[in-house]
Amino acid sequence: MATGVYQLPNLLALLPKKPGGDISPHFKEADTGYNAWVHKKLGWFFAKEVYNAEMPLLAAMAWPLASCQELRAILAYMTSSFMLEELTDRCSSTKVVNNSQLWISTLRDTEGGETSRHPFIKTMRKELIPMMKAAVDPFHWPQFIASNELFAKNVIREAFVRDADMNENAANNIQSYTVMRRETIGTRPCFVLMRSTRRLYIPDDVLAHPLMTEMEDVAIDMVSIANDIYSFKKEYGDNGALTNLLTVIHKDPTTDHLDLQERIRYATKLFNAALDRFHSCRQKLPSFGDVALDRHVSSYADGLIDWVVGNIEWSLVNHRYNTFVHEKDRQNNIMRLNNRPFSSQHFVLFIVLSILFGRLPVQSLYRMFYA
């Protein structure tokens, strides 16, 4: 294969069809309503980022059984999560702590953000959280909040790791990266929303069963691996894909000899292993002593498949990643990569701002180019 041209895996061929169907029939209605809201309520710069993310398409593909109201609630949460990323992505760990705590306290109780003047928090409190509460089943709301509390804590942890420059402990080892990514990708709250849309009333003690937790963990692993494969081209152009599984594989001492094509194959093997573990866990699930509950557990496993497949479908067609140059490349899973890392204007701007605001130590910059 030519230089700079890479064969990506056909991950969809490895997976069963979505039990919930291809896409929510309410996609167009939710998409139109959400984009009108974004245009009216959000500032131009942030609105552009939101449009580019194509969140309505992801919501409709990953939650195919969701009603229009539920899709709007899911989009409200996605927007809130996007806001958390903006509040924590380019600031000190101290600021991350403050902003994450403000974000979760607002989500937990809208009065928690009442004194904040930040436009994101105001929008969450007045617009987004009411949408969520109107659609999320009361049974699932406590689980939803608990999953977001864990998510916010891990966003803080990730910031401290980044500030302490502990990459050798957090991002240079495949296993450590996988464990950390499970809690920072933000998928667990989405799974709670999925249980709500499907009316799956699974109590906490059943969710805590070892086979249930492993099944959920490996589903998240599949989402994470797929995201890192399909977003690699974008991240490579933005910042050299500093925090991406394909980069971590290159840094891990056991796999640092692999070139990029071999790393893609290795990531595919990790995906296959996660899928095998998912099926194994599902087959071994015991009865929980109630026919209706057992049916809900089985439907939850179906929902996890919907989510994994829907996320991949979205990754293949969205304009945020732009993984493929044209339709023929998409059909053949061909990625064309500019072999000059760190050449994009986005990355140059990232470096300049990082140095100016003290967010990138000189030693990290040296390693970035010469390690």
What are these regions (language model features)?
Residues M1-A371:
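Alpha-helical, largely C-terminal catalytic domains
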